[in-house]
């Protein structure tokens, strides 16, 4: 549905050339939710704005539903953009128009008959859960309700693609979850292809099928969400994943934690389990095999892309040689282990 081929975008600023995107290629299959994650300034917004040519690439091709957008005339591009809806971090609603009036605006600009406008807007209000807000003005809506109006407006022309530019970053966590569930529901009901950008791995984890990691204008990793969570290939992907499952070291352990091993201390381990290692009774196995005892301090488990993954803080008691053998066995069983120190 979306094919970006060798996209480069260079901005001119104060006589200097600034490369925002460098040779980026990306394929978003029809009907999928695809996430692009990166830190501020990584090039995310520039990338998504190249899809509908709000930013025209310096080099490369942009294909949406088989059309090469960079080769279209202005009138052809206008028609093609009707198949590409877009929502933003800020809702950009017209304060002088009601909810109905905001959603109907693109249809009015397209000279759609009034009866068809009314029918379509009512369908969309039902879809986004705002059937009772028909005549309400934006000033009387919550942030989540405003974003629902923006989503309905973006869907007014029956687009095949929806672009989401940090669409939940201005919302509180509970509202973010409800908007993500709405996007997932719309994707499922309408078969809509969704490309979203975010700086939060929680967003990717909740609704995306595939994810790409962008850094300094380059895509450094891309795969299914389950594969990236199970086997991250870059330190940045690993960092984003760790941000979704974070366990704090208890204060009483922090006060005793030392970076150096002593014979009377025991290692404090941070263990990450993905794929098959989540369900395997590995800690019981190392206890039997290597004569070590594990004291689990805290643990957490979650799902991403249909795959379970988890994190654990634990002490491992035993003699030093047995502990080293146990850690090596766990690592060979696809458990990622970090020795945080000794207590």
Swiss-Prot record:
Top EC class, one word: translocase
Binding site for ATP: 38-45
Gene3D superfamilies referenced in this protein's UniProt entry, alphabetically: 3.30.70.260, P-loop containing nucleotide triphosphate hydrolases
Family matches, as PROSITE patterns: ABC_TRANSPORTER_1, ABC_TRANSPORTER_2, METN
The EC number(s) this enzyme carries: 7.4.2.11
Keywords on record: Amino-acid transport, ATP-binding, Cell inner membrane, Cell membrane, Membrane, Nucleotide-binding, Translocase, Transport
Residue intervals of the ABC transporter domain: 2-241
Membrane spanning stretches: none
Pfam families: ABC_tran, NIL
Alphabetized InterPro entries for the sequence: AAA+_ATPase (IPR003593), ABC_MetN_proteobac (IPR012692), ABC_transporter-like_ATP-bd (IPR003439), ABC_transporter-like_CS (IPR017871), ACT-like_dom_sf (IPR045865), MetN_ABC (IPR041701), MetN_ABC_transporter-like (IPR050086), NIL_domain (IPR018449)
Subunit structure: The complex is composed of two ATP-binding proteins (MetN), two transmembrane proteins (MetI) and a solute-binding protein (MetQ).
NCBIfam families, per database record: ABC_MetN (TIGR02314)
Role: Part of the ABC transporter complex MetNIQ involved in methionine import. Responsible for energy coupling to the transport system.
Stated name of the protein: Methionine import ATP-binding protein MetN 3
């Amino acid at each position: 549905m979306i094919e970006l081929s060798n996209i480069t975008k260079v901005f001119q600023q104060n006589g200097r050339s600034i490369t925002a995107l460098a040779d980026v290629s990306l394929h978003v299959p029809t009907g999928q939710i695809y996430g692009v994650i990166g830190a501020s300034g990584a090039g995310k917004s520039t990338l998504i704005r190249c899809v509908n040519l709000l930013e025209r690439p310096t080099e490369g091709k942009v294909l949406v539903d088989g059309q090469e957008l960079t080769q279209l005339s202005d009138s052809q591009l206008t028609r093609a953009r009707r198949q590409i809806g877009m929502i933003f971090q800020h809702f950009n609603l017209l304060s002088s128009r009601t909810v109905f009036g905001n959603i109907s605006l693109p249809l009015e600009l397209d000279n759609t008959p009034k009866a068809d406008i009314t029918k379509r807007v009512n369908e969309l209000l039902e879809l986004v859960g705002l059937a009772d807000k028909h005549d309400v003005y934006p000033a009387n809506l919550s942030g989540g309700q405003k974003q629902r109006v923006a989503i309905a407006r973006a869907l007014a022309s029956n687009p095949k693609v929806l672009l989401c530019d940090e669409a939940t970053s201005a919302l509180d966590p509970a509202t973010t979850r409800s908007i993500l569930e709405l996007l997932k529901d719309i994707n499922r009901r309408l078969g809509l292809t969704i490309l979203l950008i975010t700086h939060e791995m929680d967003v990717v984890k909740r609704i995306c099928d595939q994810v790409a990691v962008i850094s300094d204008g380059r895509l450094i990793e891309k795969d299914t969400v389950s594969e990236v969570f199970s086997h991250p290939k870059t330190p940045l992907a690993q960092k984003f994943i760790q941000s979704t499952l974070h366990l704090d070291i208890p204060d009483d352990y922090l006060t005793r934690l030392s970076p150096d091993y002593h014979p009377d201390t025991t290692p404090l381990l941070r263990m990450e389990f993905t794929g098959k290692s989540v369900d395997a009774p590995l800690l019981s196995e190392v206890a039997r095999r290597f004569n070590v005892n594990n004291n689990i301090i805290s643990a957490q488990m979650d799902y991403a892309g249909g795959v379970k993954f988890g994190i654990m803080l634990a002490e491992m008691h035993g003699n030093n040689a047995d502990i080293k053998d146990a850690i090596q066995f766990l690592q060979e069983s696809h458990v990622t282990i970090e020795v945080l120190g000794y207590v």
